[in-house]
A protein has these predicted regions:
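Catalytic cores of the polymerase beta-like nucleotidyltransferase superfamily
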Residues: 1-499
Length: 499
């Protein structure tokens, strides 16, 4: 394959390049915008490639922030200076949101979450501070000529994630790069062309994973989210565990590794089962996180049902080792594995973990709600215990979560999670569970077609009740409204009945 030597720079960006050149300054496109263009591959007849339209673009320059602002203003619809102290000015230029940063070096001192920034005047020095060779490729914003001092194009072609220079130094400069390495390996990999870190980069990460403690929750969350939403999320999660990074992101997840399950229901341990569920659910942010957390409560609720080999008495114990029967003193052996209440324990763990990573409250509530309810669909058995219409209405209503006008979670999301969970079940049980799932889904769809079950409420509001009973405000109102709402859900009271 011919090596790409030049990019076709779109008009808005090339005009910026021209403005900077006329003012005596350099302007180079850098980072993801160049990497993505190079990954598209060269044209058939020429070693050139067009930049994709309508995307964000990063650029680097020898101009300092005040000069950048002056040069941007004639071309920008909007201009932002939030990152000015780090040398970055952002602007909306045509279809692009451009971030232009002064050539610089930056380093995070141990224990600090803020980099020490020094401005420079040399492109190659600026590229040398970048994390990986695939991100250390620049293209002249005016001519499109590529500058590649660290052979990033070659590594893109080979599918290699390689640090620029010494991997230990690059990770020390900014420990978030350890998560970024996993993210790039995960998101860039395709079936026909996988990406992999170099052994020395993996070693630097594995030996220094604890450096992540100095990184803010928000920055860790952004990288974790990108890994989790990737089509190769399971590979990324495995790598986070293998390289020792997961303890600094979601440490509770490490507890799922090698936790056995009842073979009749699950043929994989909790960790492997979780990966199957994550890969089986669509890449929607709330659903992916619900899949990731859905069984995280199992390790802390693990119990073994023992049976006495002499008198047959049953007992529940935390250990799989043989024990002594409390009734007759005989020997007990483990027969079954249980995780009673793991959904509620898991919901609490998910809430704490997401709060620790500074997720928005709505996201935290939605995910913990889905985790807490993820066992509900298993209470429905098509062949022996199908629910009444009232029970299905209650299921729909109970699994609905909203804040104001914003819907956070609903029965559709829960059923998608349940369907993915079934995919990770043992083959024989899977067939039975799939039949019940289809039957429940059909009943849910049928009932929702008749009415907006999620919005069913008491036909009488607080004012109606105070007027009818001649009483003032108090707790009695909520109790009575809940009772009336329940009657509506059960079907014994119409949603518009006022009498």
């Amino acid at each position: 394959m011919a090596e790409i030597k030049k990019l076709e720079v779109p008009g808005p960006l090339s005009r910026l390049g021209e403005a900077f050149e006329e003012a005596g300054h350099e302007l180079y496109l850098v980072g993801g915008v160049v990497r993505r263009a190079l990954l598209l591959g060269p044209d058939t007849d020429a070693a050139t490639e067009a930049l994709p339209d309508r995307q964000d673009a990063d650029a680097a320059t020898d101009a300092h922030p005040a000069r950048i602002k002056a040069l941007l203003r004639p071309h920008a619809e909007n201009l932002w200076t939030v990152g000015e102290r780090f040398g970055t000015i952002a602007a909306r230029v045509g279809e692009y949101e451009v971030q232009i940063t002064t050539y610089r070096t930056d380093r995070y001192t141990q224990g600090s979450r803020h980099p020490e920034v020094r401005f420079g005047d040399n492109l190659e020095e600026d590229l040398a501070r970048r994390d990986f060779t695939i991100n250390a490729v620049a293209a002249d914003a005016l001519t499109g000529e590529i500058v590649d001092p660290f052979e990033g194009r070659k590594d893109l072609e080979l599918g290699v994630i390689r640090a620029v220079g010494d991997p230990l130094e690059r990770m020390r400069d900014d420990p978030l790069r350890m998560l970024r390495a996993v993210r790039f390996e995960t998101t860039l990999s395709k079936t026909e062309k996988p990406f992999a870190m170099t052994p020395d980069l993996e070693e630097a990460i594995r030996n220094n994973a604890g450096w992540l403690k100095s990184i803010s929750a928000e920055r860790k969350r952004e990288e974790f989210e990108k890994i989790l939403l990737s089509e190769n999320a399971t590979s990324g999660l495995r790598t986070l565990v293998r390289l020792g990074l997961m303890p600094y992101v979601v440490p509770e997840f490490m507890e799922t590794v090698d936790v056995e399950q009842e073979a009749e229901f699950h043929h994989k341990d909790v960790f492997e089962h979780t990966l199957i569920v994550v890969s089986s659910v669509e890449a929607e942010p709330i659903l992916r996180k619900a899949a990731f957390f859905h069984d995280i409560g199992k390790p802390r609720t693990l119990a073994y049902e023992h049976r006495c080999t002499y008198c047959g008495a049953k007992s529940t114990r935390k250990s799989a080792e043989e024990g002594e029967c409390d009734r007759c003193g005989g020997r007990t052996l483990p027969k079954k594995i249980h995780f009673y209440g793991h959904e509620n324990v898991g919901a609490a763990i998910a809430r704490r973990a997401m709060q620790r990573l500074a997720y928005p409250k709505d996201d935290v509530d939605a995910v913990s709600h889905l985790v807490a309810n993820h066992m509900r669909p298993y209470g429905y058995a098509a062949s022996r215990d199908p629910w009444s219409d009232a029970a299905v209405r209650r299921f729909i209503r109970d699994t609905y979560l909203a804040r104001g006008d914003r819907e956070l979670a609903n029965v559709d999301m829960l059923l998608k999670l349940a369907r993915a969970d079934i995919t990770g079940s043992a083959p024989r049980r899977r067939r039975i569970a799939e039949e019940s799932w289809r039957s429940l889904k059909s009943k849910v769809d049928e009932i929702r077609a008749e009415d907006a079950v999620e919005k069913l409420e008491s036909p009488l509001n607080g004012n109606d009740l105070m007027r009818q009973f001649g009483m003032g405000p108090g707790r009695w109102i909520k109790a009575l409204k809940d009772h009336l709402q329940n009657e509506v859900i059960e079907g014994s009271l119409g949603k518009d009945d006022k009498a």
